[in-house]
């Protein structure tokens, strides 16, 4: 029997409160906040812009540049959270390591996990070189000349280039031949979170499909840390950004076992408590590691309609030391609702039509400003088959239109 003490949760806005601070308060953070509040947790939401989705539901909100260590330390010392939950990559992660070492707060899953995964180089070297996991062939490059040398030296065409620090497909493109090189390098320099700089170039893998395997490290009733797996999530990406996802994606027993083995290896090394989005390429029974996020994953929004506990509830329970249940309820799918225009205070039309079909749901994120390719919501659907669920989810998202106020 573990000596780990059973979790005790306090009363929000009182001296006994269990305080959790989210660093990043977008649509994923918003759902984590709601899940935490349902367990009586006092939540502080931090983001770089005002009125972020998570700001709208938290007990308190702060606008802070999270890459500024001094500003971030000041707000953490002001609020004194028990647990810090990084919900985005663009954070002063060296500060999180310091705070964890100082005993100021516990970082979920760990400060090391946040630091390694904010940078594609850190997590790729851990996976491929330390853990020996199968990945695509890759090199890291600092200049366009180095990019050309990497391609000529074995990466070959076609290949993919990504900034080492970016998200949602920003700066990512496919290089199909020498004629694409100039534009791809410029785009990678523009798309990085810290401006121009280092990039990863990856050789193509001839895969059949890619999945997200949501992997949860949580304490059981005996206090021991256990690893749980959600059913695999298939997804479609356009320009590196998710547009639809579905669950469960069919896999051979051998491929599923290998996927879980890879996910167990990388999440076990990163450690801590919480959910991880492990991205994998699959061809037949072969599986390659792609990336991992130590937090809920955008493709996992489908779990809001498919699982007994969605990915946000799983993360909330796990980080609080509570048991989890990753069981699937019914096959389902998600489909993104884009802004389609640039503007503030937009309005959403067709929501009643979107929800008229049984087995559907809509989440509107409440972002204060729309952009043409910004995710403003998601359509959700369940059905007896994956094909039917995907078609239904597409109908839901297509029914919702975004208009200027």
From Swiss-Prot:
Q: Which residues form the ATP-grasp domain?
A: 125-320
State the reactions this protein catalyses: N(1)-(5-phospho-beta-D-ribosyl)glycinamide + formate + ATP = N(2)-formyl-N(1)-(5-phospho-beta-D-ribosyl)glycinamide + ADP + phosphate + H(+)
Q: Where does N(1)-(5-phospho-beta-D-ribosyl)glycinamide bind?
A: 27-28, 87, 298, 367, 374-375
* Keywords of this entry: ATP-binding, Ligase, Magnesium, Metal-binding, Nucleotide-binding, Purine biosynthesis
Q: Which InterPro entries match?
A: ATP-grasp, ATP-grasp_carboxylate-amine, ATP_grasp_subdomain_1, PreATP-grasp_dom_sf, PurT, PurT/PurK_preATP-grasp, PurT_C, Rudment_hybrid_motif
Residues that, per the record, bind Mg(2+): 279, 291
Q: Which Pfam families match?
A: ATP-grasp, PurT_C, RS_preATP-grasp-like
Positions bound to ATP: 120, 162, 167-172, 202-205, 210
According to its UniProt record, which protein family does this protein belong to? Answer: Belongs to the PurK/PurT family.
* Subunit annotation: Homodimer.
**Annotated protein name in UniProt:** Formate-dependent phosphoribosylglycinamide formyltransferase
> Gene encoding this chain?
purT
